[in-house]
């Protein structure tokens, strides 16, 4: 059996481009958010996403108790916000750096996000160091910005929507 070491795996994963997202929650355990690229669709019936969250992350207990979240997919130009939510910055400073509205689940929705998916966590599966959060989508908010943001080869890249 061939065992892949951690660094080889991480280097290979850097070749997979992914949307940049800020995942937010608010509820009985408080308000929290983090940057994630490990987000993808599961099914459209019922509309469901998955989000991967390290159980060792400081935000894990908040998401685990609140059981709601909003996936805010970032637009080009929002790299500083991604970096802020991806670091050790206190939560109040993270949220003060942008404009938010409250989604139907009570979670913060980034006003200038490319798209926001307001969700309830319907199932959690633990694998290795992470929990896979299956998220039932309750509402979607799309913005008109033409530029998306992806993380590829350990750096940000802007994408432009084709003209309609």
Swiss-Prot record:
Its EC number is 1.5.1.42. GO terms for molecular function: FMN binding; FMN reductase (NADH) activity; FMN reductase [NAD(P)H] activity; riboflavin reductase (NADPH) activity. Keywords: Flavoprotein, FMN, NAD, Oxidoreductase. GO terms for biological process: nitrogen utilization; uracil catabolic process. Induction: Up-regulated by the nitrogen regulatory protein C (NtrC also called GlnG) and repressed by RutR. It catalyses: FMNH2 + NAD(+) = FMN + NADH + 2 H(+). NCBIfam families: RutF (TIGR03615). PANTHER family: FLAVIN REDUCTASE (PTHR30466), FMN REDUCTASE (NADH) RUTF (PTHR30466:SF1). Belongs to the non-flavoprotein flavin reductase family. RutF subfamily. Catalyzes the reduction of FMN to FMNH2 which is used to reduce pyrimidine by RutA via the Rut pathway. This is FMN reductase (NADH) RutF. It comes from Escherichia coli (strain 55989 / EAEC). The gene is rutF.
């Amino acid at each position: 059996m061939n065992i892949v070491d951690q660094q080889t795996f991480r280097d290979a994963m850097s070749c997979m481009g992914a949307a940049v997202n800020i995942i937010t929650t608010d509820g009985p355990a408080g308000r929290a958010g983090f940057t994630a690229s490990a987000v993808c669709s599961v099914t459209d019936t019922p509309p469901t996403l998955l989000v991967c969250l390290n159980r060792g992350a400081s935000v894990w207990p908040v998401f685990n108790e609140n059981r709601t979240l909003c996936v805010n997919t970032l637009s080009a130009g929002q790299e500083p916000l991604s970096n802020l939510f991806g670091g050790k910055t206190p939560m109040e400073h993270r949220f003060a750096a942008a404009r938010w509205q409250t989604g139907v689940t009570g979670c913060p929705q980034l006003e200038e996000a490319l798209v926001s998916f307001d969700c309830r966590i319907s199932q959690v599966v633990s694998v290795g160091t992470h929990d896979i959060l299956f998220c039932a989508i309750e509402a979607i908010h799309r913005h008109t910005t033409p530029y998306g943001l992806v993380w590829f080869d350990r750096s940000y890249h802007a994408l432009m929507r084709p003209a309609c």
